[in-house]
């Protein structure tokens, strides 16, 4: 009589995928698209431009609205959103970080700290990437010591531009 142990691979896969299996699988599908894969050897400027382009592709793929309110086209699914976005790191870590900044930090700050006027005014453009956001905590040539950030950003109302100045050479 054989006493070999058998593992149900499908059951293990379902358990590992967790509560938000469908969202995680969608994230894997998106991450497997060659448009989202890292291109080795790109310059920093090329990689940044590509990452911004990839964010637009995420919008087109319907991959960014899960955590936002249903009345704005989202699905109020924060856990599913996190599960799906975890998968992006396998395509390009910079894409995962930048998308986390756009929709997880910038958009979530407006969503959770803003009022209904802010939501109506800014969230649709944040969700569609018409209004790109930033989160300043690291400096080229200096690192991520948030307490010692030396870069400043000054809004010029005459030009409607933001002037960024850093004392650190990159």
Segments the model singles out, each with a brief description of its role:
Residues 138:
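Cytosolic ligand/metal-binding cores
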Residues 145-149:
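Short acidic, glycine/serine/threonine-rich loops at helix termini
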Residues 166-170:
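DPxDG-like acidic metal-binding loop motif
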Residues 150-154:
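Hydrophobic/aromatic beta-strand elements that line small-molecule binding cavities or substrate pockets
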